[in-house]
Amino acid sequence: MSMQYKSIKVQNDMFVSIIKKNKELMMILDYISQLNLPNFYIAAGSVFQTIWNYYDKKPLNYKIKDIDIIYYDANNLSIEDENELENNIINHFSKLGMDYIFDVHNEARMHLWKKNENANINQYKNSEDAIDQWIATVHAIGITKEKDEIKVYAPYGLSDIFSRTIRPIKHKNNTKELYDKKVESWKSRFNNLNIIEW
């Protein structure tokens, strides 16, 4: 039976076991967890694409463009502090020879960032609220660490990741244009994707 048809627990256990094989992602997760960022996740591409690469028998970081790190701190909406945090993370891993693009965002201030792009959204309630509204079900995924255990947040389940099904999340803040752009990016780097049109 394909993994996409297995029980939620079996899928979650397999997902975590594969993620743990990505040693660089684990190094990043360990480091970020030590920063004590509130409500943090490593999220989106670097997470679900690790699974795809595993089944493609590719290096686990193959074609991963960046590492998305999110957290939620409503008590500090400073863009300067967010940028400083991102630069510190970049510098830390650059010294270790891990020259990824790191995108670090405080989801508590995302409504302010979107406003600068002439888009009006409500302030997210927490990091999970942000992930719930991302562009595709495979994209809406995050891993965090609690008491030395990896925890997975997957509001739409893991079946689409295992079956490589790109399914839009038709939230009012999302658009066909943004979805199609993401789909083209994934198609250019990964094969055998099952695309569900907007």
For the regions a language model picked out, list residue spans one by one.
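Catalytic cores of the polymerase beta-like nucleotidyltransferase superfamily
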Residues: 1-198
